[in-house]
């Protein structure tokens, strides 16, 4: 997946629109997320490792909020020959178009059904693995529990949910220091103060992170019997829950 450099917020703008996964973002997304999310490559690679261990023959895998297909590709590499199907969903037409190009660049015997649509409308069944990779945080908070319930219902016993999210902290000093370390990470990756500030403004109304405890309560409340935080770097995390 060749990536152009993200310069979307490099020029000062009097009006910052809410962040959208439009064609501009899709064109630079690989660069944007690598420079913005610490540990992203490790998370993607490990999702493939989880798939190797949890995906059973003749079951389905769901990548909800698949963006350019990084997680889907990681999964597909690990489940060759299992007669499985991956359903990859994103509501951005621009993302889906580029995702299809990325998927087509690699030969695989694993079918991928790529859907441009709302993940809240997707029927989940016979699933051995569901991935929500930095997706839930963009849903309205009041819609999150219903989606988790739908995922739990559609997972087979022993099935796995991988949930990666930016998280917030109730402890103000912890929130402050980890947020500052994340900003330093972005500065070290070449983002200017202007870019950081303008993107923060763009995300303010569309991304609403939860605390880790809220995530755990939501998952266990819907019936998941096993939960663990398996990755955290600053205020970015990835969790697993087993049905």
From Swiss-Prot:
It is an enzyme of class 2 (transferase). GO terms for biological process: tRNA wobble uridine modification. Homodimer. It catalyses: prephenate + S-adenosyl-L-methionine = carboxy-S-adenosyl-L-methionine + 3-phenylpyruvate + H2O. The keyword Transcription does not apply. S-adenosyl-L-methionine binds at residues 40, 65-67, 90-91, 118-119, 133, 200. It comes from the Bacteria. Keywords: S-adenosyl-L-methionine, Transferase. Belongs to the class I-like SAM-binding methyltransferase superfamily. Cx-SAM synthase family. Catalyzes the conversion of S-adenosyl-L-methionine (SAM) to carboxy-S-adenosyl-L-methionine (Cx-SAM). This is Carboxy-S-adenosyl-L-methionine synthase. Pfam families: Methyltransf_25. InterPro entries: CmoA (IPR005271), Methyltransf_25 (IPR041698), SAM-dependent_MTases_sf (IPR029063). The lineage of its organism: Bacteria, Pseudomonadati, Pseudomonadota, Gammaproteobacteria, Alteromonadales. Its EC number is 2.1.3.-. GO terms for molecular function: carboxyl- or carbamoyltransferase activity; S-adenosyl-L-methionine binding. Signal peptide: none annotated.
